[in-house]
């Protein structure tokens, strides 16, 4: 009942003045999906699913698959995407019934793959080969960023645990198989 008070007409599930619409809506969708035993929240879930998908980079903007922002989710349309927001976005997609064949999941996997310190056919940004430890960092967008900093020796964006968890979980949700080199 409490969470219903945050449902917006446009499908968002968030506080009125928040800058964290993606995070809040994603968590709200997970909650409503878990509580939807009788179908009571079907309409909220459907609108919320469309809402989070509209926030994904590459949907209603001019970003192409070759752009580092493509497929990611951020704090809002004007903010750069990052792996933390994209991970929550994928939680919402999974909770609302999207599988690896969903176009939104496919786009997100492109972004998630680019957050990994591992050069593959799916990941060719300049950071990927500098320190190929297989871990993940915050974002390849806007020149790249890691909350763990830059490796002084190689210039690589450092991988760190919370983003590596987010990246691995996101890849599993997006259907990456265990024999995939990523």
Cite the ranges covered by each PLM segment:
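Preference for long, amphipathic alpha-helical scaffolds in soluble/luminal domains
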Residues: 1-182
């Amino acid at each position: 009942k409490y969470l219903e008070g945050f449902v917006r007409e446009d499908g968002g599930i968030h506080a009125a003045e928040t800058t964290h619409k993606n995070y809040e809506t994603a968590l709200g969708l997970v909650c409503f999906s878990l509580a939807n035993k009788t179908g009571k929240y079907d309409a909220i879930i459907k609108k919320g699913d469309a809402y989070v998908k509209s926030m994904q980079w590459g949907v209603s903007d001019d970003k192409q698959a070759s752009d580092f922002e493509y497929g990611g989710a951020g704090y809002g349309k004007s903010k750069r995407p990052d792996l933390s927001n994209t991970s929550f976005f994928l939680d919402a997609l999974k909770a609302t019934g999207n599988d690896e064949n969903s176009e939104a999941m496919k786009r997100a996997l492109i972004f998630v793959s680019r957050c990994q310190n591992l050069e593959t056919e799916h990941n060719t940004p300049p950071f990927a080969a500098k320190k190929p430890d297989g871990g993940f960092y915050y974002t390849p967008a806007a020149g790249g960023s890691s909350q763990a900093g830059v490796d002084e020796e190689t210039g690589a964006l450092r991988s760190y645990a919370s983003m590596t968890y987010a990246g691995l979980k996101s890849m599993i949700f997006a259907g990456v198989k265990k024999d995939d080199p990523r």
